[in-house]
Amino acid sequence: QLACRDRSRIALESDLLSAAMLGIDNILCLTGDHTKMGDHPQAKPVFDLDSVSLLHTVKLLESGVDLGGNELVGEPPKFSKGAVVSPCSDSVDAQLAKMERKVAAGAEYFQTQAVFEPEKFIKFMEKAKQFGKPVQVGIIIPKSAGMAKFMNNNVAGIHVPDEMLEELKADKEKTKAGITGVEIAARIIKECKPYCQGVHIMALGWESKIPDLDPDLCIRNRFCRDAKPRCLVRAFRQIQKL
């Protein structure tokens, strides 16, 4: 993930070229949330570029030229360029317009904001098919009703329905153990999988619960059981192939 919030265009180009040298070829281009939403609200945001212009920058580097018009030395980098979209946003048309601009700028795949309303996701995907780009549905395992309320109030593009809030409140011990959250997330995955090309799990510290979400996600490998970063990367590559 490469966010524009904290970096100038020079820093972003530097990070991209460094990533290429290290063999990192999958890039997710993000504008980034404003610093006021994080735990350092006094920090000054940069936003020299946004996600669309960052995608354009990546394409430019791939052609062998940087944003200053300088030719790169050696073989140009080659990336798999991703972007994000919020299918459950209040304005679907605005999200589709953003998606179109990102595709035009070079986006090859999309990851979505966390989905808690499968019916909205399915309707969005019916319209997003026109772009012909693979989409990975975003899944968060909700840890508590408080967490769900926080996301409703503070995270754009996310809405946890009232019935899910009540489900998280119903049995506090079950919720604390992660059972309720896994049940909710697994249900969402099951409903959304036929309409997308992958699943992006944002476990937020509950990586060990990933195998419980859907046997199809992890049964072909045992890496997720270890819940270690390197193993999870391999597991994610397996998920992408499903």
Model-derived features: positions:
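A generic, well-ordered mixed alpha/beta core segment in the N-terminal half of proteins
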Residues: 2-35
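Active-site-adjacent beta->alpha loops and helix N-cap segments on the catalytic face
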Residues: 8-14, 34-54, 66, 92-93, ...
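Short, acidic/polar
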Residues: 10-16, 91-101, 182-189
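Short, ordered loop/turn segments at secondary-structure junctions
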Residues: 3-5, 29-35, 114-115, 140-142, ...
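Active-site pocket-lining/capping segments in soluble small-molecule metabolic enzymes
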Residues: 32, 45-74, 84-89, 132-188, ...
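Hydrophobic faces of well-ordered beta-strands that scaffold small-molecule active sites
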Residues: 1-2, 27-29, 81-85, 110-112, ...
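Conserved, mostly hydrophobic/aromatic
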Residues: 19, 102, 106, 137, ...
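N-terminal low-complexity segments that are often proline-rich with Ser/Thr-Pro
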Residues: 221-242
